[in-house]
């Protein structure tokens, strides 16, 4: 089976481990986008600590789960999102107002929609977490 998206596989592994009640999950291969996405999730308390293990191939990430995650996913293709359209995307993707985050990749880095609105930057949509 071919991998279509490394980020989608990583978030799917986290979702499945969270549903089965596991305390940690191993993600491989890793990428810079996955690490930045996990950093945003960790900043908002959806996951615990995570550790990057360099095996001189593609690398591994061990993520500690804390049971707060309901769902996380990837939006394909990565649609362009203007600052005015961020509200529309959050209404479509998230279950309620001020519950969860839409993750964007911008020229200022990977961040959630609230930080992007504060910094007044737009970009492409990566995924969501709640």
From Swiss-Prot:
CC terms in the record's Gene Ontology section: cytosolic small ribosomal subunit
Location in or out of the cell: Cytoplasm
Known role: Component of the ribosome, a large ribonucleoprotein complex responsible for the synthesis of proteins in the cell. The small ribosomal subunit (SSU) binds messenger RNAs (mRNAs) and translates the encoded message by selecting cognate aminoacyl-transfer RNA (tRNA) molecules. The large subunit (LSU) contains the ribosomal catalytic site termed the peptidyl transferase center (PTC), which catalyzes the formation of peptide bonds, thereby polymerizing the amino acids delivered by tRNAs into a polypeptide chain.
Pfam family, one: Ribosomal_S8
Name of the protein described by the UniProt record: Small ribosomal subunit protein uS8B
Highest taxon in the source lineage: Eukaryota
Protein family membership: Belongs to the universal ribosomal protein uS8 family.
Signal peptide: none
